[in-house]
Amino acid sequence: LPCFPFAKQLGCSPNEVAQKIVDSLELDIGEAVAVGPYVNIRASLTWLANQINQKPEPKGSILIEHTSANPNGPFHVGRARNAVLGDTFVRMHRAAGYDVTAEYYVDDMGKQVGILCWALENLDEGRVHSLLDEGGITSEPSPHSEKHDHARVLWYQAANLLKAQDASVDAGVTELVQLSEEADEDVLNRFESAYQPVLDGMLETLGRMGIHFDSFTKESRFIVDGSVETMMEKLESSELHGVAENGAHFLELESKGVKGKSTQFFYRRGDGSSLYATRDLAYHQYKWTQSGRLMNILGEDHKLQSKQVGIALEELNIQPPEVVFYAFTKLDDGKMSTRRG
């Protein structure tokens, strides 16, 4: 404790203030010592042991969603950072007496899974290695080559390279994704067959770090059960609602403090289908049925979307979650990328 602010008010030196404070203190936690103009308080080992062994009072439930990385390849250090931070919050809240649910939101119907599925169904191993060699991405065996997340990411990377050369690849992936957004059971099953071994490999990696999840929720759940469609219909009654020339629906958020070029939050495409963020609305509505408090751990690149989703949730009379953002580190040779290996 620095005593400089008190010295002028009391009309004596900071050193004298520090000593007077120490002389007047009666501490249960240990001892106080005056060190020049500072007061140092030292907790005794007995007090610390009692605090650690003391069972905290129950504080209610909290669902902490973290990691939720696309199941298209192994963790790189950037994606794993979310898991470490998220698990830290899980452990801290458990230690503080909360009933914590560690949640993983599985992106089981997006473009990344669509690319992986298309690649596994259309590319053989020889074609994959040929494409990777041409693209300068190593496909040499590694100590982890047998793990499905390390093995299948090669197909994902190869398909991305081929997509840049062959428009039919993008068309094929787009068709799969569109069918998944229509809750096509066959396509969703094919997607799961493609990504589940990858997700299992990713979870094995996290398990070695002592990171585990209590629940997994698939994004497609909210398409299949109709809750996304219900959300979109409700948003049409919002005063913020608008329709673009191509028939897409959006909320105009400028009046809510969103600035810049992205003041419109699009939630329905012109063809009537939903977007990822729309499904996020239904997901948060569901999460509130599972817990009395919600927390999301996100990278700072999600700040705008998180704010947009929060405003949309308020328009639906749903409380937004607490969000913890973490910053990124710039690397000399560019961003970490699963697609580029």
Which ranges hold each PLM region?
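NTP-dependent nucleotidyl-transfer catalytic core
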Residues: L1-G341
